[in-house]
Amino acid sequence: SSSLEGSNVGLGISFYLNEKNHFVVSNVYVNSTADKKGLKPNDEIVSLDDLECSKNDSDTIIKYIKAHEGKSVKIKYLREGKEYTTNLIPGVFDTTVICNIYDGYGEIILSSFSENSGKDFSKAMTRLQESGIKKLVLDLRNNGGGYLNAALEISSSLIPEKSVVFKEQDKSGKFTKQMTKDEFNQVKMDKIVVLQNENTASASEVLIGALKDNLGKKVTTVGTTSYGKGTEQVTVPFSDGTSFKYTVAQWYTPNGTSINKKGFKPDIEVELPEAKTTSYYKFNKKDVIKKDSVDTNAKPLQIYLMYLGYSVDRTDSYFSNTSSEGLANFQQENGLDATGDCNKKHGIYWLKKYY
């Protein structure tokens, strides 16, 4: 399926709108055209060819990029106030691996296990190695799994060669050891911190088990107990669009532990605040959340405001006068029109402040 493949068409970035209506890069996907050209988080995209970002909404920009798949697009962007120009060719990219390098450690965010995740992860690890990084934060939160083969490939970049990644038991009771892949080389880390939550499942848990059993105290898990999916399924599609899924095996960690219906308990338990697990509905152009009104986005808006420390007296779908004052204070402090109302532009910009 497309979700397992993890593919999309574009430049290979995710972005948000800032107060100047520039498209600010929030993430760059490994091995995408943007990644190959050196775009970085916080770069502000000013224009694409003759299309000025400040005069167009995100839907128009996205449509323009997709319409130019395989064609060169001139990108003008700002980095730390200095203007740069480069040519990018929109194309298919994998959306599962993001790599960031910070002072003293690297971060890899793995959103799922797709067909291409293994090679993209390997490239990210090589990048960390070339930068002299010896500590890794591996973010598996909300990663529900995917291809087990990708879990084998990714494990091969982290644990010694010829190691057991997991054991599977078929319905006859026969056990088979699944080993690391020879074509992927281990990049040794002194410390790996794995972030997990209740939505970390399946192939993600295979990876956690492989790391814990093979690397021992070098690995620390942080978050909440993982989902606990210790079985393997096969999906059979039918011509009418429906499909049939059935279980073919159960998997165990290298040391023989089953986490099915139990999950992995973290070494350090950390509960996320409500704001970190609250999503919002898409803002349309004309949507405005005004004080003393009811709106589906008023709930997440007030939850985010409260998380950021602004005055809020409720967290339901009613946007109160007090919450509007809190939003106005936020807007004033961030160079926005202090209206106390939330529209698409102000909403997206300030939501990025939270995320």
Where are these regions (language model features)?
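Extracellular LysM carbohydrate-binding repeats and other cell-envelope/extracellular binding modules
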Residues: 332-355
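C-terminal, low-ordered peptide segments at domain boundaries
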Residues: 12, 29, 37, 49-133, ...
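Gly/Ser/Thr-rich loop/hinge elements
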Residues: 94, 145-195, 199, 231-235
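Conserved PDZ fold ligand-binding element
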Residues: 34-56, 136-139, 214, 222, ...
